[in-house]
Amino acid sequence: IRDRSSLCENMFTTQTFQSVIAVNLKDCTSIEEAIQRSIKRIEGSCISIGYVKPGSVELISRSIGSTHAINSSGDIYFDVVCSAEIFNPRVGDNISCVVEKVNKLGVMAKGEDDLPVCVIIARQHHADSFQECNPDDVIKCEVVGSRFKVKDREIQVIGKFV
């Protein structure tokens, strides 16, 4: 029996990134708590470098707050440096996934072990030997391409059977 949690864990890498956090004075009982709440909001969604694993964001450093004269909202802006577990599949990576639907266009699958991916395996990538599979089958695919937008809850992947 393989360790299912380690398969998903190996897909994430620890990365450090920089961001600007706006803290409104109305929400400010403690500046540290307000900053922590703001950086926790990115967990479980995509940022510019990939999907952020829930519970993995850590604040490394922050600047002193500054205000912008143009902005009348009263927000205080902080430059923060954080580290987090990030998932961003590259071309050639292998992903294990569970088949959801099969139709004449191909296969639609979700990442196994709660991996935040929606995988589409098109028949056009398998002209002669398209592997027949059924819903709930576990398959392995190779990433041909991927895309996501900021705040997406999963990464869309085009794959082919391995």
Q: What is the meaning of each model-derived region?
A:
Residues 2-162:
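Single-stranded RNA-binding regions, centering on S1/OB-family and related RNA-binding modules
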